[in-house]
Amino acid sequence: MIKLLAKNGGVIQMTFSGVFTSKKFREQSAAYKLVKADFIKVNNLDEALDADKSKIDAFEEAYELEKPYDVGTLGLVLDHFEHVINLVGIDYVGIGSDFDGVSGILPETLKDVASYPNLIAGLLERGYTEQEIKKLLSGNLMRVWQQVEEYAASH
């Protein structure tokens, strides 16, 4: 799918979420889903009911405090970027941070936009040039955006 996206001139927007970068996170998440389903069944709860939802939310908070997720590291995010860059080339990769709605599942050093200098420093340390980093930060997305606007104007 990523190769097809690149072949068609698109850009994949890479997220920092442990869902995509950390095998351990995915394992923990799968285990949690089973425990949560069991909690709901044993307590005869319905996620659609507000009263039950508050009980489920309280369970989730307690569970996450007891068993915090391994959300990964900056290094794992950089490995994630490099894997895709090596797969399709830097011209087809961008930043799709996915900050909205993912609280608690991002690496400590990449929690919000103010953390971008950490990502940039990591890319520089791995030998990426400023020009390549500009492509990742916005250049590739803006290239595709321009192509979309040109297509829309001509049709």
Where are these regions (language model features)?
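Aromatic-lined glycan-binding groove of carbohydrate-active enzymes
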Residues: M1-F59
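Histidine/acidic residue-rich metal-binding segments in metalloenzymes
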Residues: M1-G10, L76-D91
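Short acidic/histidine-rich active-site segments
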Residues: Q13-V19, V88-L110
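Short, solvent-exposed loop/turn and secondary-structure capping segments
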Residues: T15, K23-F25, L106, Q146-E149
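Active/binding-pocket-proximal capping segment
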Residues: S29, F99-G101, D112, L141
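Intrinsically disordered, low-complexity acidic Ser/Thr-rich regulatory segments
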Residues: A51-D79, H83
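Mid-to-C-terminal alpha-helical segments outside catalytic/metal-binding sites
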Residues: K111-H155
